[in-house]
UniProtKB/Swiss-Prot annotation:
Reactions catalysed, as given in the entry: (R)-S-lactoylglutathione = methylglyoxal + glutathione
Function: Catalyzes the conversion of hemimercaptal, formed from methylglyoxal and glutathione, to S-lactoylglutathione. Involved in the regulation of TNF-induced transcriptional activity of NF-kappa-B. Required for normal osteoclastogenesis.
Modified positions (N-acetylalanine) in chain numbering: A2
Recorded metabolic or biological pathway in which this protein acts: Secondary metabolite metabolism; methylglyoxal degradation; (R)-lactate from methylglyoxal: step 1/2
GO biological process terms, semicolon-separated: methylglyoxal catabolic process to D-lactate via S-lactoyl-glutathione; negative regulation of apoptotic process; osteoclast differentiation; regulation of transcription by RNA polymerase II
Cysteine pairings via disulfide bonds: C19-C20
Active site: E173
Modified residues (Phosphothreonine): T107
NCBIfam families found in the cross-reference section: glyox_I
Protein name, entry field: Lactoylglutathione lyase
Residues noted as binding Zn(2+) in the record, renumbered to the chain: Q34, E100, H127, E173
Organism per entry: Mus musculus
Binding site for substrate: Q34, R38, N104, R123, H127, K157, M158
S-glutathionyl cysteine modifications at: C139
């Protein structure tokens, strides 16, 4: 368990856990299914998330009346994706931890269009995290692919983890779950 923190640093472990309730039995089958990011250019974003990070496009849904499309990605085998549209939709929405990319049509051609990544004022959303077997090997590959870094593994005080940016400037933490305990 972490060392007790001074009052000015936030909640102590004890206080944090005392603020939490045991899950209601009715939530037993709930799951965190998706995180959504708005994107400017689906061609750039789909290339980044599939080629650079290795995610698989599970499904694309278009909403012509509202002029937007949704792209659902996850770490899944593309051969497991059902062919039937209804079955595919139910399957997609039952996966754990999917990334939903929302594209509002026309933003890719608007030079003034950009999205706030939450890491500058006013702060809000921070990042998503990707677990990898070897942070240094992954980052070497990212460098070779020309990926923009916010933090390389040996920068700063927290050694062994990195932050990269996607085409819209969203931050992505690159971590190794087996080594994270030695970092924090």
């Amino acid at each position: 368990m972490a060392e007790p923190q001074p009052a000015s640093s936030g909640l102590t472990d004890e206080t944090a856990f005392s603020c939490c309730s045991d899950p209601d039995p009715s939530t037993k089958d709930f799951l965190l299914q998706q995180t959504m990011l708005r994107i400017k250019d689906p061609k750039k974003s789909l290339d980044f998330y599939t080629r650079v990070l290795g995610l698989t496009l599970l499904q694309k849904l278009d909403f012509p009346a509202m002029k937007f499309s949704l792209y659902f990605l996850a770490y899944e085998d593309k051969n497991d994706i059902p062919k039937d549209k209804s079955e595919k939709t139910a399957w997609t929405f039952s996966r754990k931890a999917t990334l939903e990319l929302t594209h509002n049509w026309g933003t890719e051609d608007d030079e003034t269009q950009s999205y706030h990544n939450g890491n500058s004022d006013p702060r809000g959303f921070g990042h998503i995290g990707i677990a990898v077997p070897d942070v240094y090997s992954a980052c070497k590959r990212f460098e070779e692919l020309g990926v923009k870094f916010v933090k390389k593994p040996d920068d700063g005080k927290m050694k062994g983890l990195a932050f990269i940016q996607d085409p819209d400037g969203y931050w992505i933490e690159i971590l190794n779950p087996n080594k994270i305990a030695t970092i924090i």
